């Protein structure tokens, strides 16, 4: 929640890893309208001037959430309706009401996204440039800024993909993690990426 004394806007964040229910809410016109209406009411009640939508992820059941094939199109429809509502609030109050959207940085998560379409809807796009690995059987940097010979995925690659697809560079925010990944029972003695492992574990950095 950014605070006003710093010059930033208080933003309502909706979603996150394992936050279920968005696919269901966005699947019908009535559900989308109710989602947007309740969001705008909550924003007005608590003085929020922006909303961040963090659906992880449209079209996938990652995190144990429900999903459907139409999720991506429903996501755009939801964002479009929310954009209209925020613009009306801006016109009515004279205060800018912003929409930010979080997207994954991995190739498979970026593939269904149309950056130009997103550019027309969002004020900011937060690229979650982390968890690029850590869910398979090989070691790797889970938040690599640049790719190397062992791994193509990186924050820079995600940003380039979005820019080339039509998303304005000034709308992109690069998300970085405050945690690391540990590897258990790494095969061999060489400390390299892509070494075999038996499992992974997250490690939070203290404040």
What spans do the regions from the language model cover?
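Short loop/turn segments at strand-loop or loop-helix junctions that form parts
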Residues: 14-17, 55-58, 129
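Gly/Ser/Thr-rich helix-start
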Residues: 16-17, 51, 141, 181
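Conserved beta-strand positions in the central sheet of alpha/beta enzyme cores
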Residues: 11-13, 47, 52-54, 126, ...
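Serine-hydrolase-like catalytic core of hydrolytic proteins
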Residues: 35, 39-43, 50-52, 56-57, ...
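Substrate-binding surface in catalytic domains of secreted glycosidases
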Residues: 58-207
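Glycan-recognition patch characteristic of GH18 chitinases/ENGases
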Residues: 1-44, 70
